[in-house]
Design a protein with these regions (language model features):
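Active-site-proximal loop/turn and secondary-structure-junction residues that shape catalytic pockets
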Residues: 7-11, 30, 63-69, 95-97, ...
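Hydrophobic faces of well-ordered beta-strands that scaffold small-molecule active sites
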Residues: 3-6, 24-26, 59-63, 90-92, ...
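Catalytic alpha/beta core domains of metabolic enzymes, predominantly
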Residues: 109-247
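N-terminal active-site wall of soluble small-molecule enzyme domains
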Residues: 51, 57, 62-126
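Conserved small/polar residues in nucleotide/adenosyl-binding loops
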Residues: 249-251
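Active-site-adjacent beta->alpha loops and helix N-cap segments on the catalytic face
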Residues: 36-46, 95-104, 140-154
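Glycine-rich, proline-tolerant flexible connector loops at the mouths of alpha/beta enzymes
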Residues: 25-44, 63-70
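N-terminal basic/disordered segments at the start of proteins
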Residues: 2-23
């Protein structure tokens, strides 16, 4: 079973390698869901890949934001550069981006991001027919659900699940609250996490919504803890957190 750790920057990548990760996932300056992380410039990725490969660790690069037309236009040179850098897999959440990656670099593995909300065998079979080698299942699934997904999915399609990390109140992050309240899209990696604010009850005025005066619990769900009982149905366990510190990666 593969242990996949986040690498929000080169320090985190080195830590993940040092403490036994089988693979790391990282984002470049565009197209990743962790826009506030340091991430990697495109010219830094070849050295990061070389370092990881020298230590027997694979590198997966995320391309999992909600894609708009301008985003799609920028994908071919993005995937070509990652291919030239020697990355092992693309993690993709949009079917259009998935198709572009297959056209540009068909020899690079394509993993379906949890943002695609794959939660059943039928969906897994469709992605497999499009060329996916792995699906990262929806974060809302129970261990029993994951076992059923493994049973119903093609045998050669790998299943990855998150074992630790934040749980969004929306289905695999498909939430518009941040966009509505702050103009920053959670589906573009800029979530302000208003589900974790505490709110003051009052009128419909925007001033009635204040993150600094607690009234009750937040809307967010606790982190998953399936790491304590790893089902054999999973090929890979992912640790969520492109923004996580070195200390968490060490643990």
């Amino acid at each position: 079973m593969e242990l996949l750790a986040p690498a929000g920057g080169m320090e985190q990548l080195r830590a993940a390698v040092a403490f036994g990760a089988d693979a790391v996932y990282l984002a470049a300056e565009r197209f990743g869901m962790r826009a506030r992380a340091a991430n990697f410039r495109m010219d830094e990725i070849p050295a990061a890949v070389a370092f990881a490969h020298d230590h027997g660790v694979k590198v997966h690069v995320t391309c999992n934001i909600l894609m708009h037309p301008d985003d799609i236009d920028g994908l071919p040179p993005f995937f070509r550069a990652l291919d030239a850098a020697g990355v092992d897999a693309f993690i993709i959440g949009d079917v259009g981006a998935f198709a572009v990656a297959g056209d540009v670099a068909p020899w690079v593995e394509r993993h379906v991001s949890t943002q695609a909300s794959v939660a059943n065998g039928a969906a897994a079979r469709v992605w497999h027919s499009l060329g996916a080698s792995r699906v990262v299942c929806a974060r809302e699934m129970s261990l029993a659900d994951i076992a059923r997904l493994r049973q119903d999915a093609p045998p050669d399609l790998e299943i990855e699940a998150f074992a630790h990390g934040a749980m969004c109140m929306a289905v695999s992050g498909r939430c518009l609250i941040s966009s509505y309240l702050t103009g920053r899209s959670g589906n573009k990696g800029h979530c302000t996490q208003p589900c974790r604010w505490s709110y003051q009850l009052g009128t419909a005025s925007p001033a009635a919504m204040r993150p600094d005066e607690p009234v009750g619990g937040d809307l967010g769900r606790p982190s998953p803890t399936s790491v304590v009982e790893l089902p054999q149905s999973e090929n890979a366990i992912g640790i969520q957190g492109g923004l996580k510190s070195l200390s968490l990666i060490h643990i």
